[in-house]
C-alpha cells in the first residue's frame, strides 16, 4: 500500500503521478472547475472495468487478473478483501492512476482514451485513509486549490455539514478560520478524515472513492456519515474500500477480492449466503 500512502487524493496528485509515471500533471481546483465545463461529461449510465489485468513495475506477479465490474451511476459500491487482495489497485484503475497491463475502462459504453484521462480525473474525488492537509485554516483545506476570493463560504459550510463535522467547527472561536497546523496536527484522525470528505463534497464531483476514509471515525459518526451519503441524490456514485462491515451494509453491490481476483459479489444478504469467507468477515466485524 506504499502508493496509497504517497497519494493524497485527486486534488493532491502531483506526488502520485510522478511515482506511477503518468504524463498528466496536477491541476488546481480552480483550473479543474473551468476545465470541466467544456470537455468530458459526467457519465449517466455506467462505469465499467472490462477484462482489467495489472502488474506493478518490476513484478512478475499480476496484482489484478481479468477484473470485470460494472458500476451503475448513482449506486454505492464496496470493495473488500485482505490487504494486497487488489481492491485499492482496482480503485486506482477506475481513477486512471495506473495504466492497465490489459483491458480498458469504459464510460457509458465508450472506452476512455488517453486524451480523456485528465477530464475523467476532474470528475472524480479520492478520499484516502491517510490525509494530507495544508498548514492553513479549515476553509482553505476544504476549498483546496482555490484563491480565497473565489471560495463560496456557504458551500463550504454545506460540505462540512454533509461530512458530519459542522458542530465541532461551529464551536471553534475562529470557526472556518481555525488553523489546523502542520498536516492537520491540531485535529484528531477522525476530524482530519471528515475535512477530507468535506473537500470531496465541496468539489461537487459526483464520483467519490473512499479508501478506508472512515477508519478513524467512531461508530456513531460513521453511521451518521453513511446516512448523509445515502440521502444525497442519485447523481452521486460512491466506491468504498472498507475496513468495517458497518460501512458496507447498505451498499448496492459488494465485491470481494482475493489474490487479485473477484471471488464473489452481490448485496450484503446475498454474500452472507453464498460466500463462506464473507461470513467469516462479518463474524469478525472487521476486514483485515
Protein language model annotation of sequence segments:
Residues 1-21:
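Cytosolic ends of transmembrane helices, especially the final helix of ABC transmembrane type-1 domains
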Residues 20-75, 111-113, 151, 158, ...:
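Primarily ABC-family ATPase nucleotide-binding module
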Residues 22, 104-106, 114, 139-182, ...:
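ABC ATPase nucleotide-binding domain helical subdomain, centered on the C-loop/LSGGQ "ABC signature"
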Residues 67, 117-124, 135-136, 236-238:
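ABC ATPase nucleotide-binding domain
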Residues 80-82:
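The feature captures the beta-strand-to-loop junction immediately N-terminal to the Walker
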Residues 89, 122-125, 130, 141, ...:
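ABC-family ATPase nucleotide-binding domain "signature/switch" substructure
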Residues 95-96:
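Helix-to-loop junction immediately C-terminal to a conserved catalytic motif
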Residues 101-111, 253, 262:
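ABC nucleotide-binding domain "signature motif"
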Amino acid at each position: 500500500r506504499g502508493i496509497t500512502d504517497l497519494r493524497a487524493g485527486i486534488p493532491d496528485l502531483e506526488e502520485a503521478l510522478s511515482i506511477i509515471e503518468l504524463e498528466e500533471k496536477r491541476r488546481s481546483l480552480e483550473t479543474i472547475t473551468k476545465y470541466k465545463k467544456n470537455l468530458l461529461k459526467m457519465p449517466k449510465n455506467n462505469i465499467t472495468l472490462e477484462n482489467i489485468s495489472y502488474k506493478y513495475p518490476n513484478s512478475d506477479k499480476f496484482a489484478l487478473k481479468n477484473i470485470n465490474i460494472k458500476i451503475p451511476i448513482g449506486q454505492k459500491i464496496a470493495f473488500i478483501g485482505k490487504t494486497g487482495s487488489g481492491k485499492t489497485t482496482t480503485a486506482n484503475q477506475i481513477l486512471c492512476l495506473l495504466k492497465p497491463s490489459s483491458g480498458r475502462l469504459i464510460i457509458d459504453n465508450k472506452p476512455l482514451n488517453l486524451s480523456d484521462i485528465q477530464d475523467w480525473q476532474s470528475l472524480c474525488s479520492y478520499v484516502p485513509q491517510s490525509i494530507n492537509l495544508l498548514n492553513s485554516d479549515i476553509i482553505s483545506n476544504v476549498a483546496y486549490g482555490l484563491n480565497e476570493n473565489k471560495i463560496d463560504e456557504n458551500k463550504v459550510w454545506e460540505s462540512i455539514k454533509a461530512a458530519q463535522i459542522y458542530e465541532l467547527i461551529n464551536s471553534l472561536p475562529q470557526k472556518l478560520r481555525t488553523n489546523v497546523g502542520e498536516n492537520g496536527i491540531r485535529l484528531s484522525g477522525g476530524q482530519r478524515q471528515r475535512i477530507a470528505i468535506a473537500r470531496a463534497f465541496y468539489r461537487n464531483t459526483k464520483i467519490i472513492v473512499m479508501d478506508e476514509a472512515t477508519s478513524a471515525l467512531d461508530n456513531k459518526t460513521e453511521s451518521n456519515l453513511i446516512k448523509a451519503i445515502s440521502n444525497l441524490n442519485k447523481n452521486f456514485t460512491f466506491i468504498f474500500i472498507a475496513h468495517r462491515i458497518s460501512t458496507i451494509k447498505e451498499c448496492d453491490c459488494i465485491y470481494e477480492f482475493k489474490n487479485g481476483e473477484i471471488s464473489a459479489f452481490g448485496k450484503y444478504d446475498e454474500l452472507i449466503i453464498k460466500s463462506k469467507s464473507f461470513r467469516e468477515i462479518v463474524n469478525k466485524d472487521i476486514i483485515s
